[in-house]
């Protein structure tokens, strides 16, 4: 990672309490980004090279979409789902050890060595505006955002709607937060009001130290894009968060691949592995790994490949 990019992560305590103001001209930011994408081994002709699985399927993509959206009933659970509403008082004291609070889907508040990190924050609808009616939350979570403490860092795995939410980014845009995103993802944040000075873009295996902890951007096997026209224009990633005593792995979205073993070799030992498992598309016959996800047995194998202590 270039020196100019790294410098933006080393903020003083005084700077962390000030409202962000951009010091990097937009043209400079975009020029730096274009340069890094051009020389990144993950990109080719401005797009991320995609090597997802291609498992034979008895149904086409569109057949699965139709049967999944139209044939699976009910889309909402028949029974009440147990949940515990967030209370502001539970975060009154910072946790010096590793503490995780799962907030739904891939959103977690990670507390390590007194630092708070929010992963893939999504609190409203995990879908484009036009599809909100199909993808309402079974348990509303919007108010959780207001109850949480402001994190020092927000980590993004990729730019799909269920991992990168415009309304939540706008909520944090004027807060003293540093955003860590895979290469190319910062353009979305700038559009939603985040200052370029508060965005750090990572290629795979880039790392940074922040107040005694280390964050490493690690590979994943997925895809990216928020429209048909920007498919794979930004990088996707997983993340390793190393504290003084414990190390956490956050997978984001990923199909099963050899990168889990490589991450264990280069970043281990890993204490806690937070791994995705795809929704069970019962009877639909389409392998979720072709969409860049893991079935349950893949998740278990990834856990073993990581040689992690807890899942």
Which residue stretches match the model-derived regions?
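Metallo-beta-lactamase
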Residues: 1-145, 181-252, 271-272, 277-278
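Cap/insert and terminal regions of metallo-dependent hydrolase folds
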Residues: 23-24, 39, 43-46, 50, ...
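Divalent metal-coordination and catalytic microenvironments
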Residues: 110, 120, 158, 179, ...
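Active-site metal-binding motif and surrounding structural segment of the metallo-beta-lactamase
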Residues: 131-180, 268-274
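Catalytic metal-binding/acid-base residues of hydrolase active sites
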Residues: 160, 205, 221, 255, ...
């Amino acid at each position: 990672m270039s020196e100019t990019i790294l410098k933006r992560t080393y903020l003083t305590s005084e700077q962390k309490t000030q409202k962000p103001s951009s010091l990097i001209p937009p043209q400079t930011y975009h020029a730096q980004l274009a340069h890094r994408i051009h020389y990144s081994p993950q990109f080719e002709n401005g797009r991320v090279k995609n090597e997802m699985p291609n498992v034979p399927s008895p149904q086409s993509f569109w057949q699965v979409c139709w049967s999944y959206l139209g044939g699976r009933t009910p889309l909402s659970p028949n029974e009440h789902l147990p949940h515990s509403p967030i209370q502001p008082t539970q975060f009154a004291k910072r946790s010096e050890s590793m503490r995780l609070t799962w907030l739904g889907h891939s959103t977690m508040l990670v507390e390590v060595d007194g630092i708070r990190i929010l992963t893939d924050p999504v609190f409203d609808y995990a879908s484009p505006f036009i599809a909100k009616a199909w993808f309402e939350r079974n348990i509303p979570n919007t108010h959780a955002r207001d109850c949480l403490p402001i994190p020092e860092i927000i980590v993004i795995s990729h730019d799909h709607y269920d991992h990168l939410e415009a309304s939540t980014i706008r909520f944090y845009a004027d807060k003293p937060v540093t955003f860590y995103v895979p290469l190319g993802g910062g353009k979305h944040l700038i559009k939603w009001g985040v200052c370029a000075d508060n965005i750090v873009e990572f290629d795979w295996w880039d790392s940074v130290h922040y107040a005694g902890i280390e964050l490493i951007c690690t590979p994943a096997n997925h895809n990216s894009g928020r429209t048909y026209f920007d498919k794979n224009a930004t990088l996707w990633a997983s993340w390793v968060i190393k504290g003084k005593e414990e190390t956490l792995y956050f997978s984001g979205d990923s199909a099963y691949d050899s990168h889990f073993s490589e991450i264990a070799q280069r970043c281990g030992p890993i204490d806690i592995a937070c791994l995705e498992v795809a929704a069970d598309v019962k009877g639909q016959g389409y392998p979720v790994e072709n969409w860049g996800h893991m079935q349950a047995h893949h998740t278990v194998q990834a856990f073993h490949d990581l040689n992690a202590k807890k899942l």
